[in-house]
Amino acid sequence: MMGMQQAYRNHARVLLLFVAGVLASAGAHAGSDEPPPGRKPNVVWIWADNLAYRDVGCYGSPTIRTPTFDGLARDGVRLTRYYVAHVVCSPSRVALLTGRQPFRAGITDVLRPDSPTGLPADEITLAEALHDLGYATMALGKWHLGDRPAFLPTRHGFDGYLGLPYSMDMAPTLLIRDDRVIAELPGPAAAEVTERLVDEAVRYVTANRDRPFFLYLAHTIPHPPLTLPDAARTPGRPIYEDAVEYMDRQTGRLLEAIDRLGLADDTIVVFTSDNGPMSKEGDAGGLRGRIGESYEGGVRVPFVARYPGKIPAGRVSDVPVIAYDMFPTLVHLAGGRVPGDRIYDGQDAWPVLTGRGEFSRAKPLVWVFDDNVTAVLDPPGRWKLHLGGGAATFAQPQLYDLDADPAEAHDVAARRPDVVKRLTAAAEEVRKDVPKVWTLKYPVRDPLKARGGVRTK
């Protein structure tokens, strides 16, 4: 019965996306510089794990050298106000992959090893949408959307998977190939994870160079605890800084392969982070807050994207964009449309990436932790209201004018009650949609190793 239900769901989704794809040529990227017909663009999404806003050279780091990421910005676009949709890892990833607020999937906190919850089967992921448009799909690295069989990448549109089911600070540190544990990575072995993932990425793009592909590379660093190969360490230097530079060098090997294969002009490459810094060593560039908080330092992260001939080189935009915008952006870029059977919170941000066409947002950006709306940002991006929740606790709402005070140092709620009232009303509207469920924090009682690996059959 389960197989029949899954087959029916897949058939319905394929039909929905096929019809949408047929109609898309008339309307995708309306008013913008739509890529010409021809080969669908390859999509490479590269994620750092808890990288602070200023810890990339092109964002002003005085101590960290990142020529690979800087090169993406030089040859493409850099967003100065790109936001993640949640303050912690698991729901942040849900938002990107579904184009929806994480609470719609019932995930509003970090998933733990052997949690009974994970990414629901009825969510349509970016991988599924692109797969149904003819893409090969591969996930590499940190997943963190559930480690039980039904929640793994190969059940959510990815043809293959090599990576870790959760963060490096959660035991045991397991490496999974598709649906089975293939290794446990203590100490020195964990130091080689980044290189191993990039090796796999290079093999993947080489093997799939003649068809459109979606490569999802989710690095496990610079999330602590950090272990690096001896050759990547600098005596006396913070390991966090070495880790970011190591990630940059390893990612450079993938971009070199894409260039060598002649795929650069057919590939959009995005690099960003899932959250702000967890480590005190992370530099948010004067922005307040860290992971777990909806202050700017916890949710504003680096974002650079390259697509030669489509995204102008050297472009910089300060228009607010949020992670769930990337689902419709990339689906439209691939020639499809988002399904019409559910609420999508994101919108096509292609005009922001290219500087061509109109982009306006009608609704505020909203952050939700558990069943609390923690912050609201008005569509233009000036006013940000904090309501508490998550790691932040305070008695009264706080209002900040980000145009004048991006560091959120001066609460102006008492001077602008009209703005507080308007954004509070917006928060209440969202709160009506927030289900009274959220991720359960289960202890590690039956880790994957104890089951001899994970099977999807």
Language-model-derived ranges and their functions:
Residues L17-Q398, A404-A425, E429-K432, V437-K457:
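Formylglycine-dependent sulfatase
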Residues M1-G3, P447:
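Residue-level detector of intrinsically disordered terminal segments
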Residues G3-L16:
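Bacterial N-terminal signal peptides that target proteins for export
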